[in-house]
Every structure is written in C-alpha cells, then in structure tokens.
Design a protein with these regions (language model features):
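Pre-Walker A adenine-sensing motif
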Residues: 3-14
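Conserved lysine of the Walker
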Residues: 31
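Hydrophobic anchor at the beta1->P-loop junction of P-loop NTPases
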Residues: 23
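Positively charged, low-complexity/disordered segments
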Residues: 322-324, 328-330
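Accessory nucleic acid-recognition modules appended to NTPase machines
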Residues: 193-319, 323
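Hydrophobic positions on the alpha1 helix immediately C-terminal to the Walker A/P-loop
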Residues: 34
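Short glycine-rich substrate-engagement loop in P-loop NTPases that contacts/grips substrate
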Residues: 55-80
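Interdomain motor-coupling "hinge/lid" segment immediately C-terminal to the ATP-binding subdomain
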Residues: 127-227, 231
C-alpha cells in the first residue's frame, strides 16, 4: 500500500495526543486507506494487535453496531479484555446514529486514542462541536495530487509505460481518485468507475442524507457547476438560469442544494475578496470540484475547457484547504 506521506505526517503528529483524529473527505478519496495505514503504523510502533479496534461501518459485518449504544457496549467489552491503552479506529462513522455521544463517552471512560473517518462535513457541526470543542482535530483528505498520482501510476503495469507528459494529461482527464489505478488501464473502464462513484456520492451522501426529493433539480445544479468551473456565479445566477429552462425553484432551494454538495465534499466554495475594500463579498463565488475525473465522466472531457480545468487543479493542490482561498476583486 502506497503511503500518502503528507497526511500520515499529520496523523503521526497527533498519535497518542488527547485529541480525536477526524479524517474527512469525499467518498473514495483515500480515507479508509489512511486508516489502514494508521493501524499499520501503530503495529510498527509495537502496539499489540489486540489493543486495536478497527471497524468499517460500510461492512454488513458491523451493521448491528450502527446503533450507538451497541457500539459503545462492544468497545467497552473489548477494552475490558485487554490491558493498556486501546486504539479505536472507526471508518465511515456517519453511519452510526448519534455517534458523537459514543466518541465523547469513550474519551471519558477509557484510556484510548481515537481515529474516525467520515464522508460528510456535517460531522463537525452541531452537537459534535459542543461535545468535543477543543478536543478534536480535522484532517481533510483530497484526491491525489500529481506527485501522488505518479506514485500510484507506477504500480499499474499499463500506466507505468507512459511518459510524464502523458501521465499529466491523464491526471487532468481522469482526476486523482486512488481507485482508478487498481483498474486495467482502459478509458471506458475508468470512466465507468468514476461515473459509478459520482452516482454513489450523489445518492448516498447528498440525496439520501439530506432527504432531497427533487433529484432532477439537484442533477441540473451539478451539471451547471461542472459546466462553469472557473467562472464566478451565485445561487441566484443558477436559479435564474434554471428558470429560463422552465424550472420552478427559489434561490434558497439552490443555496441549500449547494450546501448539501459541499457537505459531501463534492464541491468547494471559494468566496470573493474585495482587496480595495478589504472585505468578503457575499455574491458571485466560485465553486470548484473535488475531482475533475467525476466531471469528465459525467459531461465528457473538452479541450476548450482547459483554462477552468487547470484553475480547478491549481486551487486544490496549491492550498492546504480551499476554504483558505478567496477570489480577489481589485
């Protein structure tokens, strides 16, 4: 397994520190692999295998533990059968109802070090922020940058034969989700894989989690975003455009759908900053996609979009977090 060192450095910095490590990011961006690498790091440091509890809530094997009381009881039971510090690694924790109560109770009741992953930004809002204020650190994971892409591609027999120029062209076209490098390198196969992930993110992390009924409207908004990367616009801009296409909707509905897409880490909003007035502007933001491969699986790759594609790429991979960026107005 290839080590994504820039994230593992952060995880190592907080190992055995009294904070909960919360690894967030879009589905299939590599969070589970990082959790597995964390388990291996603990073993390499001499932690007994019996002292590591690893649960992946996407597996039916652990379906009964999606109830927070059952999960708490199971971890307490395992901890009672071992000696020393317990290391709790929980993958896709948002599948557990009121999971934050479990985490807070474990922190209080056990000598433990806790790591969790989640595919929704709402993990860090509401009750969690109240219960764990000052007691957690977020490590947000993005798809592969180009250096990481090259490392993964080197492990794929078909990709390893390509020049760096060809690799970069593929990076812009197919994006940086790690799973594409596990496939036999064929454009149709890769695009089908990416389209399936897009559908999974939209259905599980956006539509189901936010109880969205007008799925056609949501998809229209996503298509608008994909078609306008690199451009400034607002929720009202989208609303006006869709109304011109015969849709009936409010600006507030568009805004809520954009927030749902952000929460699933499918898109990132970058606000405008008025340099002259030194203030944040509340309209005409830019939205960037977490992974360009998803865009091209849905609307196709178009050479005349290269300016927006490169801007999207630079935004993601030259900043620790798109949330720290702004679009300037002179």
């Amino acid at each position: 397994m290839i080590v994504r060192e820039r994230y593992m450095r952060l995880i190592r910095d907080f190992m055995d520190k009294p904070v909960i490590k919360i690894i967030t990011g879009m589905r299939r961006s590599g969070k589970s692999a990082l959790l597995e690498l964390t388990r291996q790091e603990l073993l390499d440091r001499g932690v007994d295998r019996k002292n590591i509890i690893f649960i992946n809530f996407e597996s039916l094997r652990y379906e009964a533990l999606r109830d927070y009381k059952a999960l708490y009881a199971e971890i307490i039971k395992i901890a009672g059968q071992t000696e020393g510090r317990i290391y709790v690694l929980l993958d896709e924790i948002q599948e557990v109802n009121t999971w934050e109560q479990v985490i807070n109770s474990l922190r209080v009741d056990l000598d433990c070090d806790i790591y969790v992953t989640g595919s929704n930004a709402k993990l860090l809002s509401g009750e969690l922020a109240t219960l764990l204020a000052g007691r957690y650190v977020e490590i947000q994971v993005y798809p592969l940058d180009f250096d990481e892409y090259l490392a993964f591609a080197a492990e794929n027999e078909d990709e390893a034969k390509l020049s760096k120029r060809e690799q970069f062209a593929n990076f812009l076209r197919f994006g940086g989700l790690p799973g594409i490098h596990q496939l036999k390198w064929d454009e149709d196969r890769v695009m089908q894989y990416l389209h399936d992930i897009y559908n999974s993110v939209l259905l599980k992390d956006v539509i189901a989690r936010n109880r969205i009924r007008d799925t056609a409207l949501l998809e229209s908004i996503v298509l608008y975003l994909m078609d306008n990367i690199g451009n400034t616009f607002s929720a009202k801009t989208i609303s006006d455009f869709l109304k011109s296409q015969g849709r009936k909707l409010s600006t507030e509905t568009v805004y809520n759908y954009l927030k749902a897409l952000e929460s699933a880490f499918l898109i990132h909003k970058v606000v405008r900053f008025d340099i002259k007035g030194k203030r944040i502007l509340e309209t005409q933001e830019k939205y960037y996609l977490s992974d360009l491969g998803l865009r091209h699986a849905v609307i196709g790759y178009r050479d005349n979009d290269i300016a927006g594609v490169l801007e999207n790429t630079c935004l993601l991979y030259t900043s620790p977090s798109p949330r720290d960026r702004s679009v300037s107005r002179m």
